[in-house]
Amino acid sequence: MSTVLATHQLAIGYKNAGQATATVLDRIDVTLHPGELTCLIGPNGAGKSTLMRTLAGMQAPLAGRVTLGKDELHRLPPAQVAKQVAVVLTERVEVGNLSAYALVALGRHPYTDWRGRLREQDEQVVRQALQTVGAAHLAARPLSHLSDGERQKVMIARALAQEPAILILDEPTAFLDLPRRVEIMQLLHTLAREGNRAILLSTHDLDLALRMADRLWLLPTGGPLTVGLPEELALNGMLAQAFQSEGVEFDNEQGAFKVQRSPCGPIGLSGHGAAALWTARALERLGYEVVRDSQSMPVQVHIAGSNGSTRWHVIKPNSDTEYKSLTDVIQHLG
């Protein structure tokens, strides 16, 4: 597998006014590969943004090296780096009435002459970038008139206009609703695969990262940085350990976080399909430990359907009560 970017015993952090060094993380050895979507995840304050800025060449490392192909990243001229690495930051860009097309055209700056004139070839790249992200119809609209999801697509198009081998995005879904978050993640996954690009993004959306990433970089507070398949890091307990917090736990079986509640004891649940899934979630929210398909529990919920209608039976040692809605079940057991 080819490598487009690699770190070698990298140390990241800051030098404050007195030139004293504040190391955030050290001994980092990671790689990025063409065609892969890599997600960097971890709690706030772990150093994700510092790592992203260092890998993008925006911040010098405290020690070690970042190599871009065979070259050391931080020794290359900025114009040369810009032809290989494109960055989309979290900060909202305020550009007045600049059109989406004009913003994307700024991505051609590393290729234009000193007057910034666009050749026909540059114009074609800009149009193609907008088309690729599904934003061609937004070209003439001012950026200030776009929704957050539309704006993010345009920002990604601007990065694509640089024709980079590597795309680095700092929390690209931070201000988006759920459908737009899914849309942007699917877009980035496609851009990596079909464009043979290495894409690295940081995110707090663990569920989407687990579903969409080819590889995870897991950065807990204090390190170390761990790399692996999403499923592998879930199975070996690294995800649960990294996000361990009082009152919250990561459920390896469901691949999601669960809020720890005062226990109500075990409860049996039998049934299939969506009704069983959402009934289990409602019971767990109340604090029950749900045991599937068990006949030995003192309290059981049996789900049955007939003629398209769902019925819930709450079975106790001396009673069997039928309910027509999940609301009634939860009110009875709550």
Q: Where in the sequence are the language-model features?
A:
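The feature captures the beta-strand-to-loop junction immediately N-terminal to the Walker
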Residues: 41-43
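Helix-to-loop junction immediately C-terminal to a conserved catalytic motif
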Residues: 56
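Conserved ABC transporter NBD signature motif
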Residues: 64-72
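Conserved ABC ATPase "signature" region
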Residues: 120-138
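Conserved ABC ATPase signature
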Residues: 142-146, 150
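Conserved catalytic motifs of ABC-family nucleotide-binding domains
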Residues: 163
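Catalytic Walker B motif of ABC-type/P-loop ATPase nucleotide-binding domains
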Residues: 167-171
